[in-house]
């Protein structure tokens, strides 16, 4: 038998696995995970929501990575800004897609307006005023 002799529940056994098992969340900065996080931000997910996904680092760890890795911080800022801009365009599309002449046209319009307002509120909350271009407007 090859492998390392380990003790498990008082019994000596050989560990024959060649690759160590990954346990817990990733703590070291990983370019692949960072890219996945940035892409999830571009889809509108918050860092807190991402941290709850399996295999993702904790919210605190992502905040630390932003502090330590400028490219990660900039990627999140850009994708967040782009998502906000896209949310504005999507709000207009939602209203345009309503068929006013349909039997339930007014009901569709009210639902579309509510959805568009929610999208615009989310974009405003994400603050389009703070762009990653460095030209913040007050």
From Swiss-Prot:
Source domain of life: Bacteria
InterPro entries tied to this protein: Sf6_terminase (IPR048683)
Chain segments carrying region Disordered: 1-27
Protein name: Uncharacterized protein YffO
Taxonomic path: Bacteria, Pseudomonadati, Pseudomonadota, Gammaproteobacteria, Enterobacterales
